[in-house]
Amino acid sequence: MNWQEICAHPALKDLPFKLETNRWGHIVMSPASNRHSLLQGEIQTLLRRHAPGGTAFPECSIETTAGVKVADVAWASREFLARHGAANPYPESPEIVVEVLSESNSRAEMDEKKELYFARGAKEFWLCDTEGAMTFHNNHAVLARSALVPDFPDRVTLPF
């Protein structure tokens, strides 16, 4: 099954899981919690506020050497969107890719995703832990702040 078939398959719509594929094309599902979704939404809102030169959006599918990975949030420049529009999945990574850790994720899994996204052209990889603390990475090191969106906060707070 290819990515477009997975997206179109009626039995796979409206699942309470995020779908990705592994390097062999097998479907991998990750459960989503409301806390995860709330953090994802706040990050998207903050990106829209602090990075007006592009578009922030959730659930960005990216073709990698290890299958299709779906970033929790991505930010793409106008130039990226002019090149790729709504391709599904994207053949390269948007400039900023954000993953929100959940109980089912390991740091090793996030490190692998980070490397896969950089190999596809990401400029920065951001990681949000379960408490909202942000870490920013380029392909060489951990950054004190994002170089692309320097006003982005180092902690995402929920309204409760």
Predicted regions: what they are:
Residues 1-160:
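Gly/Pro/Ser/Thr-rich low-complexity, intrinsically disordered segments predominantly at protein N-termini
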